[in-house]
Amino acid sequence: MRLNSLSPAEGAKHSAKRLGRGIGSGLGKTGGRGHKGQKSRTGGGVRRGFEGGQMPLYRRLPKFGFTSLKSFHVAEIRLNDLAKVDGNEVTLESLKAANVITKDILSVKVILAGKIEKAVVVKGLGVTKGAKAAIEAAGGSIEE
């Protein structure tokens, strides 16, 4: 098999419409665009959301919500991510070194998701009640 011999399966592609090639083609003269009007012209058409001058739906509805800038620097990790760290001490730096979180993350919270078999010491990370119970049940501990 060579790249120059590859071709799509038979019937997988439709041939393009050949417009403006005479009456007999069925797509001559106006080429399927109808008569006159903005949509018949070259480059004609209206932008997305345009409703002919009527106030468009996206402007009739109220604004709501916002994106917290904090969300770009805070991460949630699962219990099974703790096992990816070398050694038994889990800190912000050790999570970055193990590529569990990206370098720009400033704080982390451990949530109750996944399983943990390894006893680990969690230092300086946020931990939910359920995650704390699971870590302590596995023989680990949490330090502030």
From Swiss-Prot:
InterPro entries the record matches: Ribosomal_uL15 (IPR030878), Ribosomal_uL15/eL18 (IPR021131), Ribosomal_uL15/eL18_sf (IPR036227), Ribosomal_uL15_bac-type (IPR005749), Ribosomal_uL15_CS (IPR001196)
Region called Disordered, residue ranges: 1-52
GO molecular function: rRNA binding; structural constituent of ribosome
GO biological process annotation, one example: translation
Keyword Translocase: no
Biased composition, class Gly residues, residue ranges: 21-31
A cellular component term, taken from the record's GO annotations: cytosolic large ribosomal subunit
Transmembrane segments: none
SUPFAM superfamilies in UniProt: Ribosomal proteins L15p and L18e
Keyword tags: Ribonucleoprotein, Ribosomal protein, RNA-binding, rRNA-binding
Record Pfam families: Ribosomal_L27A (PF00828)
Protein's job: Binds to the 23S rRNA.
Family of this protein: Belongs to the universal ribosomal protein uL15 family.
Record note on quaternary structure: Part of the 50S ribosomal subunit.
Protein name listed in UniProt: Large ribosomal subunit protein uL15
Annotated organism of origin: Actinobacillus pleuropneumoniae serotype 5b (strain L20)
